From Swiss-Prot:
<protein>
    <recommendedName>
        <fullName>Flowering-promoting factor 1-like protein 2</fullName>
    </recommendedName>
</protein>
<dbReference type="GO" id="GO:0009909">
    <property type="term" value="P:regulation of flower development"/>
</dbReference>
<feature type="region of interest" description="Disordered">
    <location>
        <begin position="18"/>
        <end position="40"/>
    </location>
</feature>
<comment type="similarity">
    <text>Belongs to the FPF1 family.</text>
</comment>
<dbReference type="InterPro" id="IPR039274">
    <property type="entry name" value="FPF1"/>
</dbReference>
<feature type="compositionally biased region" description="Gly residues">
    <location>
        <begin position="24"/>
        <end position="38"/>
    </location>
</feature>
Amino acid sequence: MSGVWVFRNGVVKLVENPPASANSGGGGGGGGGGGGGGIRRKALLHMPTGEVVTSYASLERKLAALGWERYYSGGGGAAAAAAMMLQFHKRSSVDLISLPKDFSQFGSVHMYDIVVKNRDAFRVIDV
């Protein structure tokens, strides 16, 4: 059950979202669905260049220029989970950016994580 709570004339009611199958395009990556039914896709914009990030290769170059390095987990219980992700860390902070290995699963949550940790370099936009 998902939706939006609407307050009108002193009454609060839940207006439910249509099921995912009602939206054209269905499910997936790229940050927001299939482009129809009112769902807006999101993209990560690198503000200094005005370039939209379209691959992990370009994202990794941009993050490296900001001091981020690939982080390779060193075994233990988290190794299996880390093998499913790309991770970046910055030596000057305790921050860690974790992204799914498959770029098609790169969504708005991951984009906003990058934006919060690099406020002057990235922005999430509607496409």
